[in-house]
UniProtKB/Swiss-Prot annotation:
Keyword set, alphabetical order: Disulfide bond, Hemostasis impairing toxin, Platelet aggregation activating toxin, Secreted, Toxin
C-type lectin domain segment(s): 1-134
Keyword Secreted listed: yes
Protein name: Snaclec alboaggregin-A subunit alpha'
Disulphide-bridged cysteine pairs: 4-15, 32-129, 104-121
PANTHER family xref list: MANNOSE, PHOSPHOLIPASE, LECTIN RECEPTOR RELATED
UniProt subunit comment: Heterotetramer of the subunits alpha, alpha', beta and beta'; disulfide-linked.
Major subcellular site: secreted
Similarity-based family: Belongs to the snaclec family.
Function: Potent platelet activator that aggregates platelets via both GPIbalpha (GP1BA) and GPVI (GP6). Induces a tyrosine phosphorylation profile in platelets that resembles this produced by collagen, involving the time dependent tyrosine phosphorylation of Fc receptor gamma chain (FCGR1A), phospholipase Cgamma2 (PLCG2), and LAT.
Length: 134
């Protein structure tokens, strides 16, 4: 038997919490890591966990929020570009493309926070953290 910290909810050996303060994906992931050892944006590995997380969000979210970050990120492994042009000038616009690519995962309100959707990582959204009990 294990216990989560006050304010956190337990499901299947993990602790979960919804945070309403909007952050971009990277900041949300960093925030989760600071909450506890092995803390991350939530991973959803079973249908039961998906139902639990959807319920938790529905009970804790501010109603006008449409998306909630989860720990899903599209990694571009095959695009290993060098970071400067052959004339030595630095690559600046490549970062802009990355910022606006829809690479980060969220749950959407219209599906009752069950359907995954890809959003631009710089969007500010509430998020769910998950960690194994300490």
């Amino acid at each position: 038997d294990f216990h989560c910290l006050p304010g956190w909810s337990a499901y299947d050996q993990y602790c979960y919490r919804v945070f309403n303060e909007p952050k971009n994906w990277e900041d949300a992931e960093r925030f989760c890591a600071k909450q506890a050892d092995s803390g991350h944006l939530v991973s959803i590995e079973t249908m039961g966990e998906a139902d639990f997380v959807a319920q938790l969000i529905s009970e804790n979210i501010q109603s006008e929020k449409h998306y909630v970050w989860i720990g899903l990120k599209v990694q571009n492994k095959e695009q290993q570009c060098s970071s400067e042009w052959s004339d030595g000038s630095s690559v600046t616009y490549e970062n802009l493309i990355k910022l606006y690519m829809r690479k980060c995962g969220a749950l959407e309100q219209e599906s009752g926070f069950r359907k995954w959707i890809n959003l631009g990582c710089i969007q500010l959204n509430p998020f769910v953290c998950k960690f194994p009990p300490q």
